[in-house]
Amino acid sequence: MKADIHPDYHLIEVKMTDGTTYQVRSTWGKEGDTMSLDIDPNSHPAWTGGSAKLMDTGGRVSKFKNKYAGLGF
């Protein structure tokens, strides 16, 4: 392998939507940083059967609904 061409691979902490945390190795951030998830298997409709509440992070859902309101879906 060539030296100094690969990103730094280190431990980070991942925080799920329910507050649980775990450590994984990643190239994201710096050693010891915490990645907070907006959507995870506990809250994603594909894994919950659509029973989880849809979160409007940053107003994206509202913007989409307003943009396509006249189509009658």
Curated annotation (Swiss-Prot):
Pfam families for the chain: Ribosomal_L31
tRNA-binding among keywords: no
Record organism: Paracoccus denitrificans (strain Pd 1222)
Function: Binds the 23S rRNA.
Single GO term (MF): structural constituent of ribosome
Name recorded for this polypeptide: Large ribosomal subunit protein bL31
UniProt-listed GO biological process terms: translation
Record note on quaternary structure: Part of the 50S ribosomal subunit.
